């Protein structure tokens, strides 16, 4: 089990994640992919990473816009797992030409 991050830790770590914001007990980011197939590839890449970590995001797909929301529900808030998965999502998005803030 991961421990909950403090507010200060969350703020500091979000500074390294372009486009990610905190909303209550979640961190969220929206990415705009070049086209719909690229958006689906991004979701597929994130699914592989999420399975590897056994930590799964909430995902909303709208045409070429994909929104990810992360929280460690078993802990009731944000943990290092959320930050690590956010970094993996950001890396996958970058490799597929998706930009944060879509």
Each language-model region and where it sits:
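Charge-rich alpha-helical segments
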Residues: 1-102
């Amino acid at each position: 089990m991961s421990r909950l991050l403090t507010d200060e830790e969350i703020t500091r770590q979000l500074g390294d994640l372009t486009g990610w914001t905190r909303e209550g007990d979640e961190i969220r980011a929206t990415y705009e992919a070049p086209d719909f197939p690229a958006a689906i590839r991004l979701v597929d890449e994130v699914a592989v990473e999420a399975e590897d970590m056994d930590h799964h995001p909430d995902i909303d797909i709208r045409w070429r816009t994909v929104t990810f929301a992360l929280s460690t529900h078993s802990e009731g808030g944000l943990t290092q797992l959320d930050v690590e998965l956010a970094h993996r999502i950001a890396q996958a998005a970058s490799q597929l030409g998706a930009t944060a803030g879509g």
